[in-house]
A protein has these predicted regions:
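Secondary-structure boundary/capping motif
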Residues: 55, 122-126
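Short, electropositive alpha-helical surface patch
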Residues: 95-96, 125-139
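Short acidic/histidine-rich active-site segments
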Residues: 111-119
């Protein structure tokens, strides 16, 4: 967020835990929307601990609508798979099949997309969840 905060040529969107109680703690509040030329080009969608998949996908819909309105040329996804219900450090409630749904939703944007794995600590399920995103994206 910080490196893009004053830029209008890149839209930054993040769905994450509410920083008042969850990581990233020090930034990512909904009111942080950018500054100067970047005002309005930073969208934080913080969610309460224990948020359901329905809540998370509601935030994803908001994110995708904003990305579509922006008219992006490409999409870079910092893919945090710590949203998995079985993740030892997270309180989100996504299940394995939700990751395929995530991939499908991002594919519907019709943008060249790069996925960068950023988090996910349920080691036994991490690979399956990552593959589910890619398979959903490619379907």
């Amino acid at each position: 967020q910080a490196i893009l905060y004053d830029r209008a040529d890149v839209l930054f969107v993040s769905i994450h835990g509410d920083p008042r109680t969850e990581y990233p703690f020090y930034l990512g509040h909904a009111g942080e929307t950018g500054t100067g030329e970047g005002a309005g080009f930073n969208l934080n969608l913080p969610l309460a601990a224990g948020s359901s998949a329905d809540t998370w996908f509601g935030a994803l819909d908001v994110a995708c609508e904003r990305i579509a309105r922006y008219g992006a040329d490409a999409l870079v996804v910092s893919l945090g798979l710590d949203t998995f219900a079985g993740d030892p450090i997270s309180t989100f409630k996504l299940q394995g099949d939700d990751f395929s749904r995530l991939g499908s939703r991002l594919q519907a944007l019709g943008l060249p997309t790069a996925f960068i794995l950023e988090g996910g600590y349920a080691a036994a399920e991490l690979g399956d969840n990552a593959v589910a995103v890619i398979e959903g994206f490619e379907s």
